[in-house]
Amino acid sequence: MNICFLMGKIISEINFKFMIQGKNKSIAIFQIEVENKTIITVKGYDEIADYCYNQLQKDNYIIIMGILDYKGEIEITEIEQFTLK
């Protein structure tokens, strides 16, 4: 398990889906762009998915703590929105 911390800008629409089978009820998937212009796909489940869908939108800046999975995507464990001044 690889824990990572990322800060970036949301560059895609947040795709929210309900899951029929499995341990999770819902998922939110979107992409962020970090400072060096790398684009990373991130995903959150259940409560985090609800927060992402209801509170975030394209062009928001976020800080994420997550787990790097085998596909190179980040599964969000904690997330916080911030603004640049």
Language model regions located:
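Single-stranded nucleic acid-binding surfaces, predominantly the OB-fold ssDNA-binding core
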Residues: 1-85
